[in-house]
Amino acid sequence: VKKRLAFVVTLSLVVMLLAGQALAQGNFPNKQINLIIQASPGGLSDLTARTVGSVAAEILGVPVVFTNRPGAAGAVAMSYVKESRADGYTIGYVPVELAMVEALGYAQDLNPSSFDLICASNIAAATITVRADSGWETLEDLVEWCKANPGKLRVGNSGTGSVWYVAGASWAQAAGVEVNHVPFDGAAPAVAAILGKHIDMVPVSEMEVRSGVESGELRILAVLSDERSQYNPDVPTLKELGYDITVAAWGGFAAPKGLPEEVLAVLVDAFGQGVQS
């Protein structure tokens, strides 16, 4: 009798637990969602995540709280998301570096298959950007200076191994010049550094240098895309200048692996609308 009673009690608890989980999933979301961003505030990833996340919050009817966890080309933030509960209340902005961090040695078992992908959000080409008062009017001017001053050009990036590091290194190799790579925890600190004259060039996206270009403090010498930008149509592509290089960042949103299908569907809808808005 005691064994039968224990079995009945255990079975009842299991049923209640499963029912509670089903009810919670059916009411998803009913509390704030934490969105982890792999870069410092102010850069492309941060701006994209906050813009899309804010729209998604309105659609979902719950707050979306943003937390920046920069470091190790995004591995710090992405590892945190991967190890979080797969309940939909912790998600992350994942950048192109997600496909690179294992090869770079920043993390193990961290790649696109580690997550349930919610949606893609953006693609942004790199640029070759310098200060407007640098004296470099064209990319040819910059290359000539670099060849006359090997190793002296300070090129800021969003972290060693990041997509903007790859952009700067690819251009330098193709141009046959030696530069000094200076890593930062995101593109925003790198842009702040070039504005403060602590570095000389940044190979980041147009969005990240737009305010500096519009204020007349920065100048874009080239874009690393197949076609010229609609925002700066007078700026040539690297291909036009003889360099067969295109580098672009992409990003999106992801959740820990194993998210319930109905929860994932809610997030896909809300964040998909956020991207389209």
Q: What residues fall within each predicted segment?
A:
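Bacterial N-terminal signal peptides
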Residues: V9-A19
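A ligand-binding cleft/hinge motif common to bilobed small-molecule-binding domains
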Residues: E97-Y106, A169-A174, M201-P233
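Bacterial N-terminal signal peptides that target proteins for export
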Residues: V1-V9
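Hinge/capping helix and adjacent helix->loop/strand transition within the periplasmic-binding protein
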Residues: A56, Y80-Y89, E102-P189, L238, ...
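Intrinsically disordered, low-complexity Ser/Thr/Pro-rich tracts
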Residues: R4-L5, Q21-A24
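N-terminal (or domain-start) structured segment
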Residues: A24-S114, K152, G176-P203, G212
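Short, flexible active-site-adjacent loop segments at beta-strand->alpha-helix junctions, enriched
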Residues: P95-E97, S134, G159-G161, L224-E227
